Amino acid sequence: TAWSLSFYGALLTLICLCVFAPDPYYKILVFLPDGIIITFQVTICSILLSLPLGLITGLGKLSRNRIINLLASTYVEVVRGLPLLVQLFYIYFALGRFLKVPDMVAAIIAMSICYGAYMGEVFRAGIESIDKGQMEAARSLGFTRMQTMFLVILPQAWRIILPPVGNEFIAMLKDTSLVSILAVTDVLRRGREFAAESFLYFETYTMIAIIYLLITLLLSKGVSMMEKKLNYYADH
């Protein structure tokens, strides 16, 4: 498959570079693990915050309350209209005027706010794709609107929501490369530090590209497996 060719090709390239040209490729690889851990931490924390924020936003856009609907819609329009890089700078310096916020925390907040808006649209579309008769049937059985949403609608919508949510996770992982501008020592910043000391820019960024490719391919495979599992249980 295309995934297997891409993943094993990248993995074989990484191994060959480290075995046949350990200086500098193996040295670069040894220098990067701390940055890889930070990249994972930023990604996971941002996912954990953006998912509930996206759900709240999606429900807000579907709310019958005009004020809540307006607030949720405005949040989505404003955030989607600004580049992530601008949001990172704005959150970092705006919070810095009032609070002493660590670089990594500011990066996570900015990533969560940005992707919360995109997730909100995904949740809204997923919920709207479910037949409205489901809501009416549940309400006729005595469920409240909130119970119906969480016990009936969302479990069905999750199958539809998962693929685009997975794509957002992958995009978020790649966008963590931008947090290096806030002095967060992610994998890209660690690579830049090594390149600045050794002047091996081509070799360093080759390794960074391979590492990002391997991580994103693993994440996409995980999402694909979850999707197949959900479809299997739904069909049986």
Task: State where each predicted segment sits.
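Transmembrane alpha-helices and adjacent helix-loop boundaries
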Residues: T1-H236
